[in-house]
Amino acid sequence: MALAIILPLRNQSELASLLKRLYDPTSPEYRHFLTVAQFTAQFGPTGQDYASVEKFARSKGFTVANTPDNRLLVHINGTAAQVNKAFHVTMTNYRHPTEKRTFYSPDREPSLELRVPVVHIAGMNNFSIPRAKYKRAPPNFRRNAIGSGPNGAYLGSDMRIAYYGGTALTGSGQSVGLLEFDGYNVSDVTASFAGQSNSVPIQNVLVDGATAGSDGDDGEQVLDIVQAASMAPGLSQIRV
């Protein structure tokens, strides 16, 4: 079983106050965000508490799989028997009330022989399983080709017309930041405008050794860029 022991944040009232100041334009701390190291030092579990949880897990026979820098999670792997013994539960299979399957879950709330506070232990049950929500169109399905793009496809400008109508709002003087987990090809962005011009500058901000290129699987990144530029054509820049 793959579990995650979740530890609580410290100084939560101070954190709530900091969040207000970070997003208050009148505050000297406006948008002065903390680094991971700064956040961990001020609000994360202490190194001593985190080490205690790691020691506890290993003493119960678990393998510690991952230790994030913010010290909020201790990822562990172990058997059901180890889970039963460590957390004073009995892992049991139950019939799902609404689905034709069984699911596993402990017979009671877990408890730990540990002085360090723990918020939650994730992975103790599979009652809910993530599933794709897409639906396959029937073979005789026909779509209305009413967009302004090739073969009636929708362009970003069509989305602006549909949602904004004749409004004068263009996003003038503002910037949009897009967090993407892969690169993109500029040629794909250009092609997505289908001959329409894009006047919004696109600036790449590469972090942690990332590169701007793509192996071709850049549909999500390109869509995000095109939609932002089309919905707000007066933007001063898009930072990707």
Locate the predicted segments by residue.
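Substrate-binding/charge-relay-adjacent region of secreted/lumenal peptidase catalytic domains
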Residues: M1-D69, H75-I76, A80-V240
